[in-house]
Amino acid sequence: MADLSAQDKLKQICDALREETLKPAEEEAGSIVHNAREQAKRIVEEAKEEAQRIIRSAEETADQTLKKGEAALVQAGKRSLENLKQAVETKIFRESLGEWLDHVATDPEVSAKLVQALVQAVDAQGISGNLSAYIGKHVSARAVNEALGKEITSKLKEKGVSVGNFSGGAQLKVEERNWVLDMSSEVLLDLLTRFLQKDFREMIFQSC
């Protein structure tokens, strides 16, 4: 019994030592594990949030890049369309108008009407002086004078028209005032282009 009592005491002592040393260590280990789990949980949550932030940022960057690319394409398309319109205007409108004017403005009857209109405009303003009329270099002065008649040619310094250095149309010079009233084909082309260009664009490009 004495031996058992000694064993019991030894057991009690071991249990007491275990209780005093292991239990606090177990509690400390449990606390460490709990803290580690909480910290790991926070790290995982923060990692998820950071990953989502990176994804959102990448999506926004990609979206902005796409929008910039789309805007650049739209702008390039607008520039190409405008260049095409200008090319069409130059080729179809201005060149065709120029060809038509070259034909019309070299007609003696048309040249005579232009000279007559210029002389009458000067008379209507009460302007007097030596008047010199010029017609296009490809127009017959004789044919124009015949079409004008003496009523108009008598008002001209040379009693008739002279040939100028322009293609077609007419010019009237008021010498005392150093005025030149210009209705040459070149000036008429610019005038008609300005007046008709808007209508031409609307007619041709209304669906663009």
Swiss-Prot record:
According to its UniProt entry, one GO biological process term is:
proton motive force-driven plasma membrane ATP synthesis
UniProt keywords (A-Z) are:
ATP synthesis, Hydrogen ion transport, Ion transport, Transport
State the InterPro entries in the record. Answer: ATP_synth_B-like_membr_sf, ATPase_V1_Esu, T3SS_HrpE/ATPase_suE
User: Which GO cellular component terms, listed alphabetically, does the Swiss-Prot or TrEMBL entry include?
Assistant: proton-transporting two-sector ATPase complex, catalytic domain
GO terms, molecular function: ATP binding; proton-transporting ATP synthase activity, rotational mechanism; proton-transporting ATPase activity, rotational mechanism
Instruction: Kindly indicate whether the keyword Ion transport belongs to this entry.
Output: yes
> Any keyword Ion transport?
yes
Q: Give the protein family.
A: Belongs to the V-ATPase E subunit family.
What is the purpose of this protein?
Produces ATP from ADP in the presence of a proton gradient across the membrane.
- Cite the NCBIfam families for this sequence: PRK01005.1
**What protein does this entry describe?**
V-type ATP synthase subunit E
